[in-house]
Design a protein with these regions (language model features):
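Intrinsically disordered or low-complexity boundary/linker segments at protein termini
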Residues: 1-16, 117-157, 254-266
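Gly/Ser-rich helix-loop-strand patches that form or flank binding pockets
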Residues: 83-133, 224-266
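Charged docking surfaces used in two-component/phosphorelay signaling
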Residues: 72-80, 212-217
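Anionic-ligand binding region
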Residues: 155-165, 196-197
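Short, conserved loop/helix-junction motifs that constitute active-site signature segments
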Residues: 23-28, 135-138, 163-171, 253-256
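Rossmann-fold cofactor-recognition segment
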Residues: 67-70
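Acidic, proline/glycine-rich short linear motifs
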Residues: 23-56, 168-196
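Glycine/small-residue-rich hydrophobic helix-like segments
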Residues: 184-240
Length: 266
């Protein structure tokens, strides 16, 4: 990763997500861009001062050599962010969600969910209750890649997952597929599963797991409830495909209690 973009609105949720972004930037030697998007009645001078304080605090708490800068944009949140993404070309966007612990829901129309739907950059969604320190705990070292096993050619996105996984102590990856009971996995999906396992297994201990359920989200949530060693969930947001589409990924972002990495097909 070369560039990480972290939108903040100065809420506790966004500042918590920023701590994840800063830790990732430090370990990846990446540039961190902290951005606040001002609505038409916002105070730009006050925002500049707040961003300066945030930059200073990050360098004190994370690393004095942290490559960090701040930006201000104006207008509609998603539209303004898309313009910044087009110019800055970040490899990852890190955003926080409010009230997203314990499977509590947030509004589907939230900024985080809209960014997932309307951009193609990987989005790392951080619930307000999540803490980066959990990545350093071996009891939460499982990464779950939930996938429909349709062909996925965006290896750059998979490399982002691999880099984030490397932050976890002794990480283990599980490729999770949810499908209805009494169904047979087609050969092309078996091949995709083997590709995913081979992509990660040299650096990360990897295995497969199948959950039988007629509803993808219910199946994933049941799995997460039963397997308490999960520290990170990754999903693929697609424009097409039978199982995990963008609206499923948006729904997961609305009630996950774990950090959630959304990877886009293109």
């Amino acid at each position: 990763m070369k560039t990480i973009l972290a939108p903040v609105d100065f809420s506790e949720a966004s500042i918590n997500a920023l701590s994840f972004a800063a830790e990732i930037s430090k370990r990846a030697s990446a540039r961190l861009i902290v951005i606040n998007i001002i609505q038409k009645d916002g105070d730009e001078e006050e925002t500049k001062n707040k961003l300066k304080i945030i930059e200073s605090d990050l360098k004190k708490s994370i690393d004095p050599d942290l490559n960090c800068e701040s930006l201000i944009a104006h207008g509609n949140f998603v539209s303004a962010l898309k313009k910044v993404i087009a110019v800055q070309q970040p490899d990852l966007v890190v955003m926080g969600t409010k009230g997203a612990s314990g499977l509590k829901r947030i509004l589907i129309g939230s900024n985080t969910v809209n960014v997932i739907a309307k951009t193609s950059v990987p989005v790392f969604v951080i619930p307000e209750a999540a803490r980066f320190e959990s990545f350093l705990y071996k009891g939460k070292n499982r990464i779950v890649l939930a996938t429909d096993l349709e062909f996925f050619e965006n290896e750059d996105a998979l490399r982002i997952l691999k880099e984030i996984a490397s932050l976890i102590i002794e990480p283990k990856l599980r490729v999770l597929n949810v499908r209805p009971a009494n169904t047979i996995l087609p050969d092309e999906k078996r091949a995709e599963r083997e590709f995913l396992l081979s992509f990660f297994k040299q650096e990360i201990e990897s295995e497969r797991f199948t959950m039988f359920s007629s509803n993808v989200i219910s199946g994933i949530n049941y799995y997460l409830k039963e397997k308490d060693d999960t520290g990170l969930v990754a999903m693929i947001a697609r424009d097409s495909g039978h199982l995990i589409k963008k609206h499923y990924s948006r729904e997961m972002a609305s009630h996950t209690h774990l950090p959630l990495l959304i990877l886009h097909e293109v």
